[in-house]
């Protein structure tokens, strides 16, 4: 499964299926065929629960799906913009439950600044879309607060 566009839907993943939230109570379900490629990033201010949440998401994916890849973006949206990522393994999420912060790093990228060009004059949103498409991601998990979710 591969999304041609970055859409404005919330995705719920579990038990070998993907549901797209299409309204307050309606979900559409797709069977997952082949490898599922999940991008993950942490954004905004650092907080103690980011590692635990990443671990929970990863553990759920690895335990409920046979063929999944998790791609971690370094330093939040900046990693998505400039393709600074690493292929995560299940062992990367071991031993982080009680560690504060985030193993991926974080940066603040306010939504109001996303439409401004970067230092080389490139559109930040287009850079993120290009990385998403080039890596053939099926979805992006964004962990953070209000600003992170607004940017997502």
Question: What residue ranges belong to the model's regions?
Answer:
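Glycine-rich nucleotide/cofactor/substrate-binding loop typically near the N-terminus or early
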Residues: 66-135
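Short glycine-rich or small-residue beta-strand-to-loop segments that form or flank ligand, phosphate
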Residues: 37-47, 103-105, 138-144
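N-terminal phosphate-binding or glycine-rich loops at protein starts, especially the Walker A/P-loop
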Residues: 34-84
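Short Gly/Thr/Asp-enriched flexible loops that form oxyanion-binding sites at enzyme active sites
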Residues: 53-57, 146-152
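Basic polycationic patches enriched in arginine
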Residues: 25-29
């Amino acid at each position: 499964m591969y999304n041609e566009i970055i859409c404005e839907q919330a995705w719920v993943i579990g038990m070998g299926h993907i549901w797209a939230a299409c309204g307050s109570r309606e979900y559409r379900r797709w069977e997952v065929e082949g490898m599922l490629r999940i991008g993950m990033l942490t954004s905004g201010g650092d907080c103690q629960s980011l590692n635990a949440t990443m671990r929970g998401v990863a553990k759920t994916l690895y335990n409920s799906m046979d063929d999944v890849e998790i791609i971690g973006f370094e330093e939040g949206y900046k990693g998505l913009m400039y393709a600074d990522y690493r292929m995560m393994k299940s062992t990367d999420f071991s031993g982080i439950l009680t560690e504060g912060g985030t193993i991926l790093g974080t940066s603040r990228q306010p939504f109001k600044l996303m439409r401004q060009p970067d230092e080389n004059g490139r559109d930040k949103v287009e850079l993120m879309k290009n990385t998403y498409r080039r890596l053939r991601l099926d979805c992006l998990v964004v962990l953070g607060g209000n600003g992170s979710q607004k940017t997502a």
